[in-house]
Design a protein with these regions (language model features):
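Alpha-helical scaffold within the catalytic cores of cyclic-nucleotide enzymes
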Residues: 12, 41-49, 75-90, 111
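Conserved RecA-like P-loop NTPase ATPase core
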Residues: 15, 63, 82
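Catalytic cores and conserved motifs of cyclic dinucleotide signaling enzymes
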Residues: 36-43, 73-77, 98-113
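Short regulatory alpha-helical coupling segments
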Residues: 2-24, 34, 39-47, 110
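A short glycine-enriched loop-to-beta-strand structural element that forms part of the catalytic core
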Residues: 27, 57-68, 88-113
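Short, acidic/hydrophobic/Gly-rich beta-strand patch recurrent on exposed beta strands
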Residues: 30-32
Length: 114
């Protein structure tokens, strides 16, 4: 089930807080999809994510895969798996690993690219 943006913001803020307090790694993949296709593509993305990962709607045409306990190479591998799962679909992905920055800065570093 695709979670909404309010849940996404709450979970992202929690991951940042846990990172600050406990030094826990996490990453995210920002996924831009064709407008109106998020619900259709979400189950496919969900099948390639780990059980601990969460897929949320961020904007009308954007999803986030929140990846707890994930380093930079792990985030890049997750992005590759997500892209391969929808081979041929017009999606753009950007991955970023949390390095002590704010959620805003992390999202900016994960700006999707073709």
């Amino acid at each position: 089930m695709l979670q909404g943006p309010d849940v996404g913001r709450l979970l992202l803020d929690r991951l940042v807080a846990e990172g600050v307090r406990y030094g826990r790694d996490f990453a995210l993949v920002r996924i831009t999809v064709p407008l109106g296709s998020a619900e259709e593509l979400a189950p496919t993305f969900g099948r390639v994510l780990r059980d601990a990962d969460v897929l949320v709607r961020w904007e009308a045409d954007e999803l986030l895969a929140l990846l707890p306990a994930t380093d930079r190479p792990g985030a890049e591998r997750a992005a590759e798996r997500l892209k391969a799962a929808v081979d041929g679909a017009a999606v753009q992905l950007g991955a970023a690993h949390w390095v002590g920055d704010t959620a805003f800065d992390l999202l900016a570093r994960a700006q999707p690219r073709a």
